[in-house]
Amino acid sequence: MPKMKTKSGAKKRFRLTGTGKVIAGQAGKRHGMIKRTNKTIRNQRGTNILCESDGRIIRKSFLPNG
């Protein structure tokens, strides 16, 4: 049986750390930023580590070879 292919959308959105945790970009930064404080905008920079249950779903379903 051939290997499962990695979902190309997940490949662009998620990364795996060395310990197997899943890193994703911070959501909610596309529009509507004028209403938010500078502190909120600043805190939304960078990436987040997904919780264990979400990370397990991403690893098994979308990144099978990662």
Curated annotation (Swiss-Prot):
One of its GO terms (molecular function) is structural constituent of ribosome. Keywords: Ribonucleoprotein, Ribosomal protein. GO terms for biological process: translation. One of its GO terms (cellular component) is cytosolic large ribosomal subunit. The keyword Cell inner membrane does not apply. It comes from the Bacteria. InterPro entries: Ribosomal_bL35, Ribosomal_bL35-like, Ribosomal_bL35_CS, Ribosomal_bL35_sf. Belongs to the bacterial ribosomal protein bL35 family. This is Large ribosomal subunit protein bL35. It comes from Azorhizobium caulinodans (strain ATCC 43989 / DSM 5975 / JCM 20966 / LMG 6465 / NBRC 14845 / NCIMB 13405 / ORS 571). The gene is rpmI.
